[in-house]
């Protein structure tokens, strides 16, 4: 389960970087890229230093708080990570992925009710967020709520199937467009 949660952190970090970086600020984009590279290569102290420096320049950037939270989790600083997740959400309350990640962190800290609230908020913001349903199911299983956990897993599986079909269709369309150009 710990490896699964670790992979979830990495996946969401990469998704968040791809979706949230301000393309107009090359310096910030470069910093986020370096932070991600350092973090993904498990150079957490260097990544934390780079993130702290970037936060001095961009103190209201939710993505940087998210990255710092992720790094602090790897360093075993869960309480600081939770504060950074809270800050990321206060700066960007409409990002369902950050709620999912904070929910995972709360669950690891034993706050299953807080985790459920975060997963529910993530679903409210993005009803197609399969990870929110999957993680909510995990917490419900831990609480012995097996029926509702199964319902969440069913929804998550359907959403994942839809995502896979959409990705396949996009690839087919891209290949067709590429072949038309030849």
Map each language-model feature to its residues.
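Alpha-helical tetratricopeptide repeat
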Residues: 2-182
